[in-house]
Amino acid sequence: MPKKVFCGVVTKAKCDKTVKVSVLRVYKDKLYKKVIKRYKEYTVHDENNSCKEGDKVFIQEHRPISATKKWVIVRVE
């Protein structure tokens, strides 16, 4: 099974080797046909401490690194 890859923006980068990434999900409501935007924050492992707040990053599923970190950074733009 392929691993999920999401694109998001770094919202917090204060901890060592850990960042918070906000991912936007856009979908259309089936009943009311309204476009809805939802954001979800993921705790992501940043091995090299290469991210700053506001960076656009791609994250990928990974084995659990800690109790909350199950994602790693693939690419920083």
From Swiss-Prot:
Q: Which GO terms describe its biological process?
A: translation
Superkingdom: Bacteria
- List the keywords (alphabetical): Ribonucleoprotein, Ribosomal protein, RNA-binding, rRNA-binding
Q: Gene3D superfamilies, from UniProt?
A: Nucleic acid-binding proteins
**Gene Ontology molecular function:** rRNA binding; structural constituent of ribosome
Q: Which InterPro entries match?
A: NA-bd_OB-fold, Ribosomal_uS17, Ribosomal_uS17_bact/chlr, Ribosomal_uS17_CS
Q: Name one Pfam family in it.
A: Ribosomal_S17
Keyword Cell cycle on entry = no
- Listed GO CC annotations: cytosolic small ribosomal subunit
Briefly, what is this protein's role? One of the primary rRNA binding proteins, it binds specifically to the 5'-end of 16S ribosomal RNA.
SUBUNIT field: Part of the 30S ribosomal subunit.
Family, according to the entry, reads as follows:
Belongs to the universal ribosomal protein uS17 family.
Report the PANTHER family cross-referenced here.
40S RIBOSOMAL PROTEIN S11 FAMILY MEMBER (PTHR10744), SMALL RIBOSOMAL SUBUNIT PROTEIN US17M (PTHR10744:SF1)
Q: NCBIfam families of this UniProt entry?
A: PRK05610.1, uS17_bact
Write down what this protein is called: Small ribosomal subunit protein uS17
Which taxonomic lineage is given here? Answer: Bacteria, Pseudomonadati, Pseudomonadota, Alphaproteobacteria, Rickettsiales
